[in-house]
């Protein structure tokens, strides 16, 4: 694990959940100072929206990343191909495919060979089988368009459709395009109660990247006055320093590396942390991740 490239996700310093916010240039300097090999850049405002980066600004950012010694860089796109299915007259899929193509062009200009994307959240306006077909078709077109830019897409197992690792593997197999790889994470199968080693072994042939964070479960209960008692509800999942949570990353990485995985590992702080969102606490979490990975 100590040989895998380590990336810091810029969502961690984006202010998205009330934490310290840095500009994309400030963030790159931060990642370099924390001894990361590269960055995963949030491809939307306030960091890296294609709307805000013309050719000159792209060249400046590429030079900035190179000067900081950040060589392993990925763009993080945000897609939901099943969005707004109740309004068929709006070309949502076309707009999102165009967004992904714009990110592929942006990645090529920055020297970033990968763009992360998602599937879709299940929508009540269409049967599951129709949503699956829609996503397969959209992913295939996105992959073909990315290939023209010399960029490969990373599909992350995050949204509802194909969240389970077996379904995720099925989806990748059905699209069957060399420019669509797996950005397969341990987080979802860990929450599902799956065997992480088995999941990593099964997905290893498709894996080119993974994004990580660690969590603990905190029980929640709702008081029922008529019963003078509490009713359990879905636990909260709280972000904690890497290696201190319930996700068995030793098993996940051990199996992935044994199966031949050599891709990058991006650390993200995308939800409230124990200790808060001050820059010092964000830095502490990032250092803990680097130390954990480099010690193994």
What residue ranges belong to the model's regions?
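A short, acidic, amphipathic alpha-helical segment used as a generic capping/interface helix at domain edges
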Residues: 244-258
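Active-site cleft segment of glycoside hydrolase catalytic domains centered on the general acid/base Glu
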Residues: 124-139
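N-terminal pre-domain/capping segments
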Residues: 1-108, 130, 147, 177, ...
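Acidic/histidine-rich catalytic cores of soluble enzymes
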Residues: 5-10, 39, 139-246
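Short acidic/polar active-site loop segments enriched in Thr and Asp
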Residues: 37, 71, 113, 208, ...
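Active-site beta-loop-alpha junctions enriched in small/polar residues
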Residues: 11-14, 42-44, 77-80, 120-122, ...
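Active-site groove signature of glycoside hydrolases
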Residues: 107-128, 149, 154-158, 267
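A short, acidic, flexible beta-alpha connecting loop/helix-capping segment that sits on the rim
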Residues: 266-281
């Amino acid at each position: 694990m100590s040989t895998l490239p380590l990336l810091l996700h810029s969502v961690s310093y984006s202010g998205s959940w009330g934490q310290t916010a840095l500009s994309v240039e400030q963030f790159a300097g931060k990642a370099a100072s924390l001894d990361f090999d590269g960055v995963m850049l949030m491809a939307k405002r306030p960091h890296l929206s294609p709307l805000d980066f013309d050719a000159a600004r792209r060249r400046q950012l590429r030079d900035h990343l190179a000067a900081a010694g950040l060589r392993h860089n990925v763009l993080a796109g945000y897609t939901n191909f099943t969005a707004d299915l109740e309004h068929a007259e709006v070309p949502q899929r076309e707009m999102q495919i165009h967004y992904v193509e714009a990110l592929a062009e942006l990645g090529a200009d920055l020297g970033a060979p990968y763009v992360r994307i998602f599937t879709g959240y299940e929508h009540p306006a269409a049967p599951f089988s129709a949503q699956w077909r829609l996503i397969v078709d959209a992913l295939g077109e996105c992959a073909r368009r990315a290939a023209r830019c010399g960029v490969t897409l990373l599909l992350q197992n995050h949204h509802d459709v194909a969240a389970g690792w077996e379904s995720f593997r099925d989806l990748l197999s059905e699209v069957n395009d060399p420019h669509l790889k797996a950005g397969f994470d341990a987080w979802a199968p860990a929450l599902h109660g799956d065997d992480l080693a088995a999941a990593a072994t099964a997905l290893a042939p498709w894996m080119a990247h993974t994004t990580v964070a660690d969590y603990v479960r905190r029980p929640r209960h709702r008081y029922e006055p008529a019963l003078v008692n509490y009713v359990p509800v879905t636990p909260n999942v709280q972000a904690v320093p890497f290696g201190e949570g319930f996700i068995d990353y030793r098993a996940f990485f051990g199996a992935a590396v044994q199966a031949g995985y050599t891709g990058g590992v991006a650390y993200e702080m995308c939800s409230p942390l124990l200790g808060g969102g001050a820059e010092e606490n964000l830095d502490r979490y990032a250092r803990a991740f680097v130390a954990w990975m480099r010690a193994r």
